[in-house]
Amino acid sequence: MAVTRLKPADPQIPDNIILSTVDAMLNYCRAHSFWPVTFGLACCAIEMMAAGGARYDIARFGYEVFRPSPRQADLMIVAGTVTRKMAPLVRRLYEQMPAPKWVIAMGSCAISGGPFVDSYNVVPGVDTIVPVDVYVPGCAPRPEALINGLLALKKKVINPKVALVK
């Protein structure tokens, strides 16, 4: 496989300048520095804490610091069963996050209500409250699955046109 080096169209531009758009650079930087706020409600939160430990080392992907406040975060990870009483709080946390913001639904309870979906007080999926960007299935999903979801979100942020659905 031959590699061809493209020359700039304008001879005035030197070879060591990278031509890009500001949006592409911002999306690249955003994708490599998520600041997650966690909203752990059940056993999925334990797996989320395990993903932040030394064994899985999510710091190598740029997600090492979980933020204590939604005002400092751009990613919300909802892990566990969301009850009807907790739904307004989830919405309020989402609204307090600065734009751009993303949401990951972690676990079958957050995605669809899980085994408690028939209960009178369980929300059948967090996507009825806030828009969800990535779903991480499982009961409880392993830390590797959460890392896979974070990498999928990274791809979505770098190239937002691929994820647009009309």
Curated annotation (Swiss-Prot):
This is NADH-quinone oxidoreductase subunit B. NCBIfam families: nuoB_fam, PRK06411.1. It is found in: Cell membrane. Gene3D superfamilies: 3.40.50.12280. Binds 1 [4Fe-4S] cluster. One of its GO terms (cellular component) is plasma membrane. InterPro entries: NADH_UbQ_OxRdtase-like_20kDa, NADH_UQ_OxRdtase_20Kd_su. It holds the Pfam family Oxidored_q6. NDH-1 is composed of 14 different subunits. Subunits NuoB, C, D, E, F, and G constitute the peripheral sector of the complex. Keywords: 4Fe-4S, Cell membrane, Iron, Iron-sulfur, Membrane, Metal-binding, NAD, Quinone, Translocase, Transport. Its cofactor is [4Fe-4S] cluster. NDH-1 shuttles electrons from NADH, via FMN and iron-sulfur (Fe-S) centers, to quinones in the respiratory chain. The immediate electron acceptor for the enzyme in this species is believed to be a menaquinone. Couples the redox reaction to proton translocation (for every two electrons transferred, four hydrogen ions are translocated across the cytoplasmic membrane), and thus conserves the redox energy in a proton gradient. GO terms for biological process: aerobic respiration; electron transport coupled proton transport. Belongs to the complex I 20 kDa subunit family. The keyword 4Fe-4S applies. [4Fe-4S] cluster binds at C43, C44, C109, C139. The keyword Protein transport does not apply. One of its GO terms (molecular function) is NADH:ubiquinone reductase (non-electrogenic) activity. Its EC number is 7.1.1.-. It comes from Moorella thermoacetica (strain ATCC 39073 / JCM 9320). It is a peripheral membrane protein. It catalyses: a quinone + NADH + 5 H(+)(in) = a quinol + NAD(+) + 4 H(+)(out).
